[in-house]
């Protein structure tokens, strides 16, 4: 199963790297190849000879890869068909539908998703989901009304097809919109014509959205303008829109951003709590005159409780990719236990991988997918073979304790000897407790080491940096958030108002203490290693180095594994040759940003729009410079004071060292 799920995932990844969807000839060839692979797998996989079985196994994996490629292509073709006709771009259309998700408010208005039921343009394949903005223009303009998830509206909107900036090393916005099913962007063009309709959207998704909105409102009422309210909201319902930029920077520079996203740690904790509650209630059913454990074992009820509880919390988090991965692993292990089967942890991870990609084949385009699955895979790989040794060691200790107790009872000693025996037993228990504590700390350190080196190449690929303080910061932050902050915040989620307010206040205070520690760690000298975006060869060599380093003790030349990282950490220079220059005009929308490079110098002409517009300085220019490996600009030239040209300069000056600034202001 592991190989088939991996091959299926490889096919999905291959499709997402294509510039165009396959045509009719490719579909015909793929179907023929798939049928041939299935025939070979069925005919030769059960053979007696090892070579015959190997051919059948390879054919089965090829069929799985082709199935993944074809499935992702079919899903993409179906979704791309829901496109806004070009002739309707920039024209007013009246749409009727419901608000979906959590609206986001800022100084310019409100942004929200809108599920369309009807449109007056009578377009048959109209985009099912729109990303809309309800702007506030001028001082006299009225603020947008409060938009509640599930409320139905009739709006006059002006739409356009999704179009993102195309730049090297910058997040692909179009892929993100496609993954979320957003096939048109726009704004409310006539606010006075907006009409709230009777009734609400039905369904589980709408109910969950309304619950998330109520919880966010309760947290806002309890915390007000608290500095770290956004992190509390993120831990409670998975919405990260309210996290301030300063907190985001500290979390990013210390490698702890994963802690404020509801991930496997939180879903597993909630699932374990629900399993404990369900199993405990089932075992005590005799107190109410029921013998339910005789009908269904309490262990199976606990497994079912873990699945249901984990699903509820993952839904509350918006079912992001890490939460999906954790819940599918929980569900796979729970279903296997309920059916009387035992699955290896790697098989559980493989099942979760296949389920996530079947539900959302675009998940491979998000950093969370790779970081989440690779982190768990690294932990499983690093701990493989050690759990059996640990169990044998614990069994030997238990046998020694039992033998000692039996010898002690066989010949009762005198009173002083009894005290000496009691002291000896106490010392033995203390040694065992200290030994268990040391082993747990060692196992936790080994897991943290595995995650750190496994995610470093991916962090360099996605964020063009490696946080050097990540291991130290995570060693403190993970137990702090997992054992203190998250349970307290979840207690606030469960408690009714106003009993929830003290929990949220205490959770915010604990977050504030954590952020002070992380801020000190981030400010302790050079804590972030900036690297250019690695190429395919550097990533492949780094992956080999990771696997090599995580091999068991005694593996040949295990200490030489860091040599495979050299192409990643000491990349080839990207500057143009001597005597030449390279000019790159960045796609920043309205405005300009041009990078001019020579063999030893770099000049940036304009920095694009600022936060009042598309914020291209922070979203486009800075990530591009980091991905290109530009650590210092010799000159920043600002042509004139227009915000489309000078608005992004503060973001560049804050993120990149600049020798001189020349401006026509």
Regions found by a protein language model. Name each.
Residues 24-34, 371-372, 474-479, 533-538:
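Alpha-helical transmembrane segments of polytopic membrane proteins
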Residues 98, 142-145, 149-152, 156, ...:
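Non-globular, low-confidence helical/coil segments that flank catalytic cores
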Residues 204-222, 231, 239, 247, ...:
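Hydrophobic alpha-helical segments of integral membrane proteins
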Residues 53, 57-258, 396, 401, ...:
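Membrane-interface helix/helix-cap signal primarily in integral membrane proteins
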Residues 215, 235, 263, 318, ...:
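Conserved hydrophobic/aromatic pocket- or pore-lining residues that grip, position, or stack substrates
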Residues 1-83, 90-92, 203, 207, ...:
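N-terminal leader/targeting segments
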Residues 100-104, 368, 588:
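Feature for secretory/organellar precursors and membrane-associated catalytic proteins
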Residues 3, 11, 186, 239, ...:
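Hydrophobic alpha-helical transmembrane segments in multi-pass membrane proteins
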């Amino acid at each position: 199963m592991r190989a088939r799920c991996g091959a299926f995932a490889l096919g999905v990844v291959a499709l997402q790297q294509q510039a165009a969807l396959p045509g009719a000839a490719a579909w015909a060839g793929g179907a023929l190849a798939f049928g041939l692979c299935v025939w070979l797998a069925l005919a030769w996989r059960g053979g007696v000879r090892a070579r015959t079985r190997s051919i059948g196994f390879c054919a089965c994996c090829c069929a799985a890869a082709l199935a993944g490629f074809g499935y992702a292509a079919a899903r993409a073709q179906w979704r791309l068909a829901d496109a806004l006709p070009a002739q309707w771009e920039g024209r007013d259309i009246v749409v009727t539908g419901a608000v979906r998700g959590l609206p986001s408010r800022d100084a310019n208005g409100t942004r929200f998703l809108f599920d369309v039921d009807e449109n007056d343009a009578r377009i048959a394949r109209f985009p099912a989901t729109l990303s809309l903005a309800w702007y506030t223009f001028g001082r006299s303009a009225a603020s947008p009304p409060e938009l509640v998830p599930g409320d139905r509206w009739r709006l006059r909107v002006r739409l356009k097809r999704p179009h993102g900036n195309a730049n090297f090393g910058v997040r692909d916005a179009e892929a993100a919109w496609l993954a979320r099913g957003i096939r048109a962007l726009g704004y409310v063009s006539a606010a006075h014509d907006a009409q709230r309709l009777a009734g609400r959207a039905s369904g589980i998704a709408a109910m969950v959205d309304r619950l998330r909105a109520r919880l966010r409102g309760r947290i806002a009422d309890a915390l007000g303008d608290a500095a770290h309210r956004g992190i509390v909201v993120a831990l409670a319902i998975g919405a990260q829109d309210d996290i301030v930029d300063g907190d985001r920077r500290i979390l990013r520079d210390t490698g702890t951003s994963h802690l404020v996203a509801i991930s496997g740690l939180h879903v597993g904790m909630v699932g374990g709590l629900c399993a404990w509650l369900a199993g405990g209630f089932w075992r005590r059913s005799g107190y109410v005159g029921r013998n339910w454990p005789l009908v269904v074992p309490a262990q199976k009820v606990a497994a079912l409780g873990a699945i249901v509880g984990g699903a509820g919390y993952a839904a509350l988090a918006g079912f992001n990719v890490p939460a999906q991965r954790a819940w599918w692993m929980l569900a796979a292990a729970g279903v296997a236990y309920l059916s009387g089967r035992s699955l290896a942890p790697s098989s559980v991870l493989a099942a979760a991988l296949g389920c996530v990609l079947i539900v959302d084949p675009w998940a491979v385009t998000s950093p969370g997918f790779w970081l989440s699955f690779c982190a768990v895979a690294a932990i499983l790989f690093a701990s493989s073979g050690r759990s059996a040794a640990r169990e044998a060691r614990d069994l030997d200790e238990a046998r020694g304790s039992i033998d000692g107790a039996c010898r002690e009872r066989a010949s009762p000693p005198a009173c002083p000897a009894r005290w000496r025996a009691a002291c000896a037993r106490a010392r033995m228990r203390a040694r065992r407790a200290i030994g268990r504590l040391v082993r747990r700390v060692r196992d936790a350190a080994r897991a943290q080491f595995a995650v750190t080196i496994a995610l470093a190449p991916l962090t360099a690929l996605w964020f063009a940096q490696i946080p050097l303080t990540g291991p130290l910061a995570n060693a403190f932050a993970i137990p702090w958030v997992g054992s203190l902050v998250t349970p307290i915040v979840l207690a606030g989620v469960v408690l009714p108002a106003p009993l929830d307010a003290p929990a949220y206040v205490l959770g915010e205070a604990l977050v504030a203490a954590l952020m002070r520690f992380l801020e000190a760690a981030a400010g302790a000298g050079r804590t972030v290693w900036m690297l250019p975006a690695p190429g395919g060869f550097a990533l492949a060599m780094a992956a080999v180095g990771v696997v090599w380093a995580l091999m068991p003790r005694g593996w040949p030349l295990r200490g030489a594994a860091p040599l495979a990282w050299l192409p990643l950490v000491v990349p080839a220079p990207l500057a143009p040759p001597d005597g030449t220059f390279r000019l790159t005009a960045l796609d920043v929308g309205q405005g300009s940003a041009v990078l001019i490079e020579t063999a030893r110098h770099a000049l940036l002409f304009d920095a694009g729009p600022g936060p009042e517009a598309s914020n291209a300085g922070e979203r486009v220019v800075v990530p591009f410079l980091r991905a290109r490996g530009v650590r210092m600009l010799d000159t920043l030239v600002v042509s004139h004071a227009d915000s489309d040209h000078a608005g992004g300069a503060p973001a560049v000056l804050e993120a990149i060292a600049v020798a001189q600034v020349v401006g026509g202001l």
